[in-house]
Amino acid sequence: MNRLPSSASALACSAHALNLIEKRTLDHEEMKALNREVIEYFKEHVNPGFLEYRKSVTAGGDYGAVEWQAGGLNTLVDTQGQEFIDCLGGFGIFNVGHRNPVVVSAVQNQLAKQPLHSQELLDPLRAMLAKTLAALTPGKLKYSFFCNSGTESVEAALKLAKAYQSPRGKFTFIATSGAFHGKSLGALSATAKSTFRKPFMPLLPGFRHVPFGNIEAMRTALSECKKTGDDVAAVILEPIQGEGGVILPPPGYLTAVRKLCDEFGALMILDEVQTGMGRTGKMFACEHENVQPDILCLAKALGGGVMPIGATIATEEVFSVLFDNPFLHTTTFGGNPLACAAALATINVLLEQNLPAQAEQKGDMLLDGFRQLAREYPDLVQEARGKGMLMAIEFVDNEIGYNFASEMFRQRVLVAGTLNNAKTIRIEPPLTLTIEQCEQVIKAARKALAAIRVSVEEA
C-alpha cells in the first residue's frame, strides 16, 4: 500500500530537529533516544548500507555512530561527550580545522547581509574569490567557475575541455588506473573503479585509462590515439591519488605528462580536489614540480569545513569558449555569497598561518612515526607513505585495515579507509593538528597495532 503524505508528521519531525539544533548538550536519555532515531532513520530513509560501511566506528557501541559537534579545532565530540582526534578530516575538508573562527565569522557576517545572490545582479564575493584564485594558482590560470562539490568541478573541467577541443577534432580523454574523480556520469567515466562504474554502464564514450605513474604508458596511449584519429582532448589526473590509496607517482611524472600534453596538443586537467589547499605541504600539489595545468579542479577544503564549494579554474584561452554564452554551463548555488565568504576566509587563514609549511613539518613527523611502526610490525603493516598531511598506512590484508580503524576509534582517534584500496587506511588530519596531538596519534597507532597482533596470534 502506498504511504499517504503526512504534513503533521513532517511538521513534528522538523520541529524536533530544530529543538535539537538549539541544544548545546544532551542528557543521557536524550542521547540514547537520538542514537536510536538516527540509526532508524538512516536505515529507513537514507540508506541502510551506510550503517554497515561505518561498522569500524560502531564497534565500541552504537553511540559511536552519532556525531554531535566539533570539539576543538582538531577534534570531534560524540553524543556521549567523548572527544576524538580527527585524522580523517572529512576526507580532506577540514584543512583549517573544525569551525575555524575566521571562517565561521566570515560566513556569519555574510549571512547577516545576504545569504544567496539574486542571480541577476553582480555578486561581489564571487568576483573577489575569482581574483584571489587567479593570484593564488600557478601559471596562466585566470578564470573560475564555481560550483558545490569536487564532482561538479570535474564535470565543468571535462565540458570546458570538450568545448575547447571539439572544433579541433579532439574528443578523447585519458585518465589513470586507480583514479577517483567523482560519481556523476562524466566524472565517473574518468574514475577507475569497477564497483562504481559497472552499475551505470555504458558510461560516456571516449575515455581511456593508463597505469598511474607510468609515463611510457601515457606516451603510448597519446601516440596510438593520434594514429587512429582519436586525438586526445585532455589528460585528467590527480597529482597524488587519494582514494586510490594515497599513491605517489615517481618524481618528475607530472612534469613529463605536461610535456606530453604540449607535444600532442592535449589539455592537462589536474584534479586537486583532495591534494589542494595546502594539504601536501604546498598550496597545490602540482607546485612540488612547478607544473602548470590548463584546468585545475578544487573543492573540499576550499570551503574551510564550513560551506560546500568547488571551483574549476582555467586559462583565458580555454575559458574563453564560455565568453559568448556564459550560460552554457551554470549552477544555481555555485559561487553563492556564503560559500565565497568561507573560501576567501579559508585562503586568508592558510596564507596568514602558513599552513602548507606546517603540513610539511607535521606530516614528516607523523610519517616518520608510522614508518617506524611499519618496521616494528612487518607482519601487519605493508607500507606507510604520503606527502605533507596526506598519508596512508597499507596493511597486509583488508581485515587488518578494518581492525586498525576500529582500534584507533577505541583510542579516540578517527581514521577511515580509502574508496579504491580496501587495505589502506588514510591519515588526513586538519593542517592545524598540534605537535602534541601528532604524538598522541602515533601512540594510539602503536597501541592499536599491539592489540591487533595479540588478536591475530590468539586466532
UniProtKB/Swiss-Prot annotation:
EC number(s) recorded for this UniProt protein: 2.6.1.82, 2.6.1.29
GO terms (BP aspect): L-lysine catabolic process; putrescine catabolic process
One of the record's GO molecular function terms: diamine transaminase activity
Catalytic activity: an alkane-alpha,omega-diamine + 2-oxoglutarate = an omega-aminoaldehyde + L-glutamate; putrescine + 2-oxoglutarate = 1-pyrroline + L-glutamate + H2O; cadaverine + 2-oxoglutarate = 5-aminopentanal + L-glutamate
Pathways involved: Amine and polyamine degradation; putrescine degradation; 4-aminobutanal from putrescine (transaminase route): step 1/1
Top-level enzyme category: transferase
Binding positions (pyridoxal 5'-phosphate): 150-151, 274, 332
Domain of life (superkingdom): Bacteria
Residue numbers bearing the N6-(pyridoxal phosphate)lysine modification: 300
Obligatory cofactor(s): pyridoxal 5'-phosphate
Keywords: Aminotransferase, Pyridoxal phosphate, Transferase
Function: Catalyzes the aminotransferase reaction from putrescine to 2-oxoglutarate, leading to glutamate and 4-aminobutanal, which spontaneously cyclizes to form 1-pyrroline. This is the first step in one of two pathways for putrescine degradation, where putrescine is converted into 4-aminobutanoate (gamma-aminobutyrate or GABA) via 4-aminobutanal. Also functions as a cadaverine transaminase in a a L-lysine degradation pathway to succinate that proceeds via cadaverine, glutarate and L-2-hydroxyglutarate.
Classification via HAMAP family: Putres_aminotrans_3
Record PANTHER family: AMINOTRANSFERASE CLASS III, PUTRESCINE AMINOTRANSFERASE
Family (UniProt): Belongs to the class-III pyridoxal-phosphate-dependent aminotransferase family. Putrescine aminotransferase subfamily.
NCBIfam families the record matches: PRK11522.1, putres_am_tran
Protein name: Putrescine aminotransferase
Organism lineage string: Bacteria, Pseudomonadati, Pseudomonadota, Gammaproteobacteria, Enterobacterales
